[in-house]
Every structure is written in C-alpha cells, then in structure tokens.
Amino acid sequence: MPALPWLDENLWFPHPDSALKDPNGLLCVGGDLHPARLRLAYENGIFPWFSEDQPILWWSPDPRCIIRHEDLHISRSMRRFLRNSGLTYSFDQHFTLVVQACAAPRSYSNETWITRDMLQAYSDLHQIGVAHSIEVWRESELVGGLYGLAIGRCFFGESMFSKETNASKAAFITLVRQLHAWGYRLIDCQVPNPHLLSLGACQISRKEFLSILEIEVRADFSHPWKMTIDPTGY
C-alpha cells in the first residue's frame, strides 16, 4: 500500500482524487474529529471511518452512492406498511440515543465503527446544528432511526438502525421525502448496499459528486427541523 498523508493540527485535506483505488477511497490518516475538521471533510466529499484500534482513517470512495427524491422507490407493500404501521416520527428529539442504537452490535457482527470518540464528535456537531437525527417510535419505544449531517442543500447520511422490521426503511423514506419538501438536492449514502439500492439509491462518479457539492454545500440554507409532510400519506 502506498504511503498515505498524515494530517496534523492544521485544518486541511488532500484532494479526494488522490485517494487509493484499493482499498477504494482511502485518502489519509490522522488529524482529529473537531467539528471544524469534520465539516470541512464532508464539504469536500470526505468522511471518517475507522475501528477502535485504528487511527482516524479518512475516505472518499469512487463511485459514490447517493439518492435523490425523484429516484426514491417505495414498494406497494412498503406503502401499505407506512399507511398502517402506527409508527410516529420526530426529528432531533433523541440524537444521542439514535447514535448509540446505531453503534450497538448487530445480529451479523459485534464490531462497530461508531467509537466513543465518534459519538462525542457527532454529538458536538448536533449541538451546533449540523448533525441531525430522525426517530421512529412505536408508542414510547424508539424502534428505528438514522442520523447524519446537513450542510447547505445536502444531507450526509451516516448510519441507521432498526429494532423492528421496516423501521429503518420507514426512517429513510420519511427523511428523503421531508428533505425534498425542504429543498434538499441529494442524500449522500457513501457506499452502496442492497438495502439502499432497493430504495432507489444509485452510484455516481466521485467527480460528479464533488461538482454537486461545490455548489450545494455553499447554499445559504436553513430551516426548522419540524415535520411538514404526512409520513403516512400514501
């Protein structure tokens, strides 16, 4: 593996075009998780992803997985579920609980990349109005949700969780619809998986992704994080 740039206390990143092809998108190492550095990273198509026993690793894969509202696919069975499930939704009511639930062991793995330092970093971003969560409720129980960053007219999804069937899908679909209603242009999904692709996510080149960010993350854009759509309206 070629030597990677090591970040110091100065606030900078290498250009994403210098990222490795294998492993896809690995760009640089080190630095910190200060809110200013994290925001700069996302604005430039870069995100941190590392395990507890690793230094901070920064990534910008090519291609990039995104979803736009016009590509959102909701199956008939999912529409019925959303109409009749009895689930309710909120924004930013329990951000820390959502991140902790995303970090919990899954049925297929006990590993997590959401370390204690990552939890603190994204909680700091939440406190300054950059990171947000959507919560899915079954009465008073938190059964699903996801979190990410909102910068300009782009939302950068980080992780989702589900404690009952379809709860994470419901969170994702509701978020995509609400972001569209607010005027967002796209959601960054980072890397593809079957779950996201089944909902309409697609892959675009890193070059195209960066050209979109260059315009959209600089948009002067703010709004209250309050539900304005009917999440059961299908």
Swiss-Prot record:
Keywords: Acyltransferase, Cytoplasm, Transferase
GO BP: protein catabolic process
Recorded superkingdom: Bacteria
Main location: cytoplasm
Compartments in which it is found: Cytoplasm
E.C. number: 2.3.2.6
InterPro entries reported in the protein's UniProt record: Acyl_CoA_acyltransferase, Leu/Phe-tRNA_Trfase, Leu/Phe-tRNA_Trfase_C, Leu/Phe-tRNA_Trfase_N
A GO term for molecular function: leucyl-tRNA--protein transferase activity
Catalytic activity as recorded in UniProt: N-terminal L-lysyl-[protein] + L-leucyl-tRNA(Leu) = N-terminal L-leucyl-L-lysyl-[protein] + tRNA(Leu) + H(+); N-terminal L-arginyl-[protein] + L-leucyl-tRNA(Leu) = N-terminal L-leucyl-L-arginyl-[protein] + tRNA(Leu) + H(+); L-phenylalanyl-tRNA(Phe) + an N-terminal L-alpha-aminoacyl-[protein] = an N-terminal L-phenylalanyl-L-alpha-aminoacyl-[protein] + tRNA(Phe)
Transport among keywords: no
Matches recorded under NCBIfam families: aat
Family recorded in the similarity comment: Belongs to the L/F-transferase family.
Protein name stated in the entry: Leucyl/phenylalanyl-tRNA--protein transferase
Organism: Hahella chejuensis (strain KCTC 2396)
